Amino acid sequence: FSQTYQDMFVLTMLKGKTDGRYFEIGAADPFKGSNTALLERLGWTGQSVEILEHEVEKFRKLRKNPIIHADATQLNYNEILSGHYDYLQVDCEPPTISLKILKMLPWDTCTFGVITFEHDHYADVSRKIRKESRDFLSSKGYVLVAPNIAPDNKSAYEDWWVHPDHVDPEILERMKIESENALNAEKYMLFL
């Protein structure tokens, strides 16, 4: 399902959890490249957000968890999100939108175990999104485990984060060591 094994990274960091909860911003296709389809099949519950009507229609026909058809920059996340989520995906186009949404989330009332954030550094003319998102998530207590995920080892487009209070410390330590040596996402799947 996932483009570069994001779903497997989530499962690795959460020790194969089968009853998790996710929030997905930028769902796109319900299966192709989906970071939550496998999680849903494993019993996870969650909610997705997507702006494209044709993707929302497919999603509603093919997936069981709900989807919100909306411009993600126009949502009131204080009304939608509360408590703990095991996984957060932020993947909107262009990357300036992803950063704007990241900063809109209710960080005082929500926690996330694992976050995949698409910064599209390879296409970011300003070269600011990756640094700003990293500074922001670090300030919230998140740890960057897998920086600069790239499907082709060249086009860095995404960072993978965890909150140390919500993942196994041994797995976190092993992943941090491995991340120093790996660019390919496949190398991060060590523990399942």
Residue ranges and their predicted role:
Residues 36-45, 65, 83-90, 94-191:
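Conserved acidic-Pro-Pro-aromatic motif
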Residues 1-78:
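SAM cofactor-binding core of SAM-dependent methyltransferases
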